[in-house]
């Protein structure tokens, strides 16, 4: 008989509840995310998706919390706001806090990969919104994270730039296959990117969908459209005329 060792999930959440003051937000969440899986969190505003992501990131010290969770040691967080320090150049933003000897060379290579290698010595105020978010993505991936937590990172971008960022993210993460948790309000974005989609409702995981649409994904694919409609209905959106 062959014995197989159980593989621990990259993210393990056990009966996690979270509240702010007297306002409960998460209720008894239990969740396993395997290593390398891309998970999207969908839900209406106030459903708890950002609170769950911030819990995994170890943020919000003022929250009352019960239960437990475990994540890898090497975690990067990507926000909707690029959060670049305005007094530092782009490349200095990327290398801040890095101790590796090849930090500058690696940062330049990553900026080249995201298409803004020529902006390395520029300051954030001179960048467009899309360029800032490319720099933020480069900063997150430069640290070779085992877990990337992304809170609506493309929400403030125009539609064309957002599509370019989707393609860029998929190409970059294919190299290292980090585990990814993405918070988004965009159903199409979730279906385009994720391996798995969780729908949060009133602080609980109400639905868990595996995305089986083949890559490269196209909204015209019947399976894409079917899942999109099911997700929209679960979010309370009538799909008859969509």
UniProtKB/Swiss-Prot annotation:
EC number(s) on file: 7.6.2.14
Membrane topology: Peripheral membrane protein
Domain ABC transporter per the UniProt entry, residue ranges: 11-227
GO molecular function, one term: ATP hydrolysis activity
Compartment(s): Cell inner membrane
Substrates-to-products reaction catalysed: ATP + H2O + aliphatic sulfonate-[sulfonate-binding protein]Side 1 = ADP + phosphate + aliphatic sulfonateSide 2 + [sulfonate-binding protein]Side 1
Keyword line: ATP-binding, Cell inner membrane, Cell membrane, Membrane, Nucleotide-binding, Translocase, Transport
Residues that hold ATP according to the record: 43-50
CC annotations in GO: plasma membrane
The keyword Flavoprotein appears for this protein: no
Record bears the keyword Nucleotide-binding: yes
Family statement drawn from the similarity comment of this UniProt entry: Belongs to the ABC transporter superfamily. Aliphatic sulfonates importer (TC 3.A.1.17.2) family.
Record note on quaternary structure: The complex is composed of two ATP-binding proteins (SsuB), two transmembrane proteins (SsuC) and a solute-binding protein (SsuA).
Function field: Part of the ABC transporter complex SsuABC involved in aliphatic sulfonates import. Responsible for energy coupling to the transport system.
Protein name: Aliphatic sulfonates import ATP-binding protein SsuB 1
């Amino acid at each position: 008989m062959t014995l197989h060792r159980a593989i621990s999930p990259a993210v393990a959440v056990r009966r996690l509840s979270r509240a702010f003051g007297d306002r409960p937000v998460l209720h008894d969440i239990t969740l396993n995310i395997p290593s390398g899986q891309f998970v999207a969190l969908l839900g209406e505003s106030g459903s708890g998706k950002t609170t769950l992501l911030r819990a995994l990131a170890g943020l919000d010290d003022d929250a009352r919390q019960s239960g437990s969770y475990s994540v890898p040691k090497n975690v990067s967080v990507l926000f909707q706001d690029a959060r670049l320090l305005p007094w530092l150049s782009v490349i200095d933003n990327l290398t801040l806090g890095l101790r590796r000897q090849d930090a500058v060379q690696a940062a330049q290579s990553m900026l080249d990969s995201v298409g803004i290698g020529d902006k390395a010595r520029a300051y954030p105020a001179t960048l467009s919104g899309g360029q800032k978010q490319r720099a933020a993505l480069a900063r997150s991936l430069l640290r070779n994270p085992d877990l990337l937590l992304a809170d609506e990172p493309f929400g403030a971008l125009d539609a064309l730039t957002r599509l370019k960022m989707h393609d860029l993210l998929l190409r970059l993460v294919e190299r290292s296959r980090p585990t990814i948790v993405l918070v988004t309000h965009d159903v199409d974005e979730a279906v385009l990117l994720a391996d798995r989609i969780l729908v949060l409702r009133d602080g609980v995981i109400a639905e868990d969908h595996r995305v089986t649409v083949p890559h490269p994904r196209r909204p015209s694919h019947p399976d894409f459209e079917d899942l999109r409609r099911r997700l929209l209905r679960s979010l309370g959106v009538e799909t008859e005329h969509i």
